Amino acid sequence: MGFITKAIPLALTAASVINGAEILETRAGVQTLADKYIVVMNDGISDKDFDSHRSWVNRNHRRRLIRRGAKAMGGMKHTYNFPTGLKGYSGHFDEQMINEISKRADVKYIERDARVQINAIEQQDNVPSWGLARVGSKEPGGTTYYYDSTAGEGSTAYVIDTGTDIQHEEFEGRATWGANFVDDMDMDCNGHGTHVSGTIGGKTFGVAKKSNVVAVKVLDCNGSGSNSGVIMGMEWATKDAQQKGADKAVANMSLGGAFSQASNDAAAAIAKGGVFLAVAAGNDNVDAADSSPASEPSICTIAASTEQDSKADFSNFGQVVDVYAPGDSITSAKPGGGSQVLSGTSMATPHVAGLGAYLIGLGKGGGPGLCDTIKQMAIDVIQNPGASTTSKLINNGSGM
């Protein structure tokens, strides 16, 4: 997955069946990682049977390396065990080993792991932002953000991205480092994650100015990562939120790619775990039904609007879109201090995650049901939203 200030397609769609397990085939143009796979177990598999399967994989992998004396494969790398769903693992295996795994009756499907790359559409320093004013107003063109003084207090936002500059003055000590699944640098060396975090909970740029922010790094300095690493970040955020109170948590994923069943299943597991998840629709001006995790129906999928209340020309659209939010020329925090301007559905999505945190602070409940609340509060103003797409734009209900 890459973040949605422009993502290359990533996906595995059509399925072939080999001895019972689906090995999902890769679409043309997808940058797969050589000999790397994501294996997803059957629904409902017990922890005991999952442990037994992994032991079998590790034994067989070691035996194959000893017997062959050929190119070394790394074997199993990440293990996924969401509290409310997805169990599986990723790793580096040769074709024969993958075929052996596919014969197992306890395997649901296998995907090739894939890489994504994000690219900012536009960047400019120190330009006033309009997005906040639009969230707090019924009419366009305002310059004031109206909001309740609770401002998301007591809520926590998990930003699954490039990391966050937790020392930035925007966060006033409310940002913490959570986990890193991509490199050994616990910092935002790209800038995307800090911008997203600022829109959620920054004192100046944030929709929920008193919310806590947790950085979950899954993309590197170039905005690049893998589906397998992103799923690890999703699992970590789900477990941490459940330990601290899932009904007080929101998660933001300003990233994505072409359809991936594993990514969608992981997103569904976050929602099933009681966490409100906002996901970018994508920046390719196409139907988001072919994007992941945007196409997962149990989460909240966000398209980008302009200051003139029209669909941003880059924004994806379609029936899977739940709501529009400001995403064109949005000002927010940048690493090291100060601000920058970025555009994309990446920038629209944290307005919605921030609104979710804001509503939690107001006592409006939490969890995936927040998406319905946000849609009910939205105003019907988007011009030319796209085929079969909602024309609703988010609003915080301040009445202004």
UniProtKB/Swiss-Prot annotation:
Molecular function in Gene Ontology: serine-type endopeptidase activity
Sequence intervals crossing the membrane: none
Sites carrying sugar chains: 222, 252, 396
Annotated active site: 161 (charge relay system), 192 (charge relay system), 346 (charge relay system)
Maturation-removed propeptide residues: 21-119
EC number, as in UniProt: 3.4.21.-
GO BP annotation list: proteolysis
Residue ranges annotated for the Inhibitor I9 domain, each copy included: 36-118
Predominant location category: secreted
Enzyme class, spelled out: hydrolase
Family: Belongs to the peptidase S8 family.
Protein name (database record): Subtilisin-like protease 7
Taxonomic source organism: Trichophyton rubrum
